[in-house]
Amino acid sequence: MKDAVGNIQRVVVLGGTSDIALATVLRLAGRRPGVQVTLAARPGERRAAASTSLQSAGMQVSEVDFDATDRTSYERAIASCFETGADVDVVMVAFGLLGDQERAWQDVDAALELVQVNYAAAVACGVLVAGRLRAQGHGAIIAMSSAAGERPRRSNFVYGSTKAGMDSFYTGLGYALAADGIQVLVVRPGFVRTKMTAGLDVAPLSQTPEQVAEVIAAGLLAGRHTVWAPPTMRWVMSVLRHLPRSVFTRLPV
């Protein structure tokens, strides 16, 4: 639960090895020691390294096993996150899979893996988290969507379609939870230089995880429901969304 002056005291990260999520946790915690963080992710070196980095910043870190490809892990993981420690102030839904885009539109298994991780698991976790936050009577959800969901592009339309669905769900969840006083912040970043995008050509308006974290923190504090990172990406995507198909398909995107 937030402290007497409204500072966040406990954060849960579903997808606890995400570069953007870790940068956001550091930004939300500021320099205050003792903030409690639960990292829900697959066990391994990446989760251990993430935990160590946050502990070095003065946070109290716990780890929970969670695998977005394993349907049986969702209830167990989220129950563990909520049933140990203080009330949860913020839950970040930060797991995701970029995948091989050329394979994804030609291979059923590759396509379904993207759907399972980016959409089905995200929806299931949203339902479970919403129930927990309603039960405790407060909290916020940060849902990591993507600008890729705004309009299908030849280069990543399978990934983009899963993010479009995830985005719609969390936008609607925000409507549903408004009466309970629970904020749902949908984050639509453009290209972010992270481990997931390593090896890809850097796109215009690319950002670091720390830059995205600043946008997220500001949006959360302001009570926003949607933020773009960088903010100018909103206008770029608005233009692209309204271009005629004959023009859009000639663009190198």
Please identify what each model-predicted range represents.
Residues 17-19:
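Conserved glycine-rich cofactor-binding loop
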Residues 186, 201-238:
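C-terminal helical subdomain
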